[in-house]
């Protein structure tokens, strides 16, 4: 284990924050590491902005393929008090993506809220060595303090803006 860790640490290289990783490198904040040194991995990064929108990116390099997003049970995706806003496939920059957007009403807790969840998956089948990408966006509206909350229309526009920037390069996202 120590030798593995030292190999990974020796493979770390500096990188500007807005610079794409080179070759088969996995990006980390202000750095990159050779993905082949990691063996089998699953990586995720979450970001929350000042409006409390959480964006999460996930990828992995293992061969396990789970239930495709659009084949998942609606009761699981929507939960008991939820509804689907959109479920389907579309093309973005030549990539076929699967998406499921939903909204849940939580009126039964001490802090009633509306929770939005947007999910996107690319290369679910992992065919041809393509790397899986999962992207999600979550947002909650506290109904007791909803004065400056984003509207559903604004959230959809933001999601479409974000997903419209996705481009695939065979060795990197």
Locate the predicted segments by residue.
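Surface-exposed amphipathic alpha-helical segments
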Residues: 1-30, 135-173
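Charge-rich, low-complexity N-terminal segments
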Residues: 2-69
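Surface-exposed beta-strand edges and their flanking turn/coil or helix-capping segments
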Residues: 4-7, 70, 112-117, 133, ...
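Acidic-enriched, low-complexity/disordered segments with a strong bias for Aspartate over Glutamate
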Residues: 17-18, 34, 60, 71-73, ...
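Generic signature of intrinsically disordered, low-complexity segments enriched in small/polar residues
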Residues: 33, 44, 50, 67, ...
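Signature of long, low-cysteine stretches enriched in small and polar/charged residues
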Residues: 49-129
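Short, well-ordered strand-loop elements centered on a beta-strand within folded domains, enriched
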Residues: 129-135
């Amino acid at each position: 284990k120590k030798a593995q860790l030292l190999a990974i640490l020796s493979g770390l290289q500096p990188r500007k924050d807005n610079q794409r990783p080179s070759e088969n490198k996995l990006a980390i904040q202000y750095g990159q590491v050779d993905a082949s040194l990691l063996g089998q991995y699953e990586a995720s990064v979450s970001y929350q902005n000042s409006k409390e929108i959480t964006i999460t990116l996930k990828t992995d390099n293992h061969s396990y393929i789970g239930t495709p997003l659009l084949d998942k049970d609606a009761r699981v995706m929507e939960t008991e008090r939820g509804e689907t806003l959109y479920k389907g496939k579309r093309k973005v920059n030549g990539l076929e993506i699967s998406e499921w957007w939903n909204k849940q009403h939580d009126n039964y807790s001490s802090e009633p809220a509306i929770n939005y969840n947007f999910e996107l998956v690319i290369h679910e089948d992992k065919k041809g060595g393509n790397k899986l990408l999962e992207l999600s966006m979550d947002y909650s509206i506290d109904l007791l303090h909803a004065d400056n909350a984003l509207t559903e229309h604004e959230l959809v526009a933001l999601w479409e803006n974000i997903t419209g920037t996705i481009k695939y390069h065979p060795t990197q996202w």
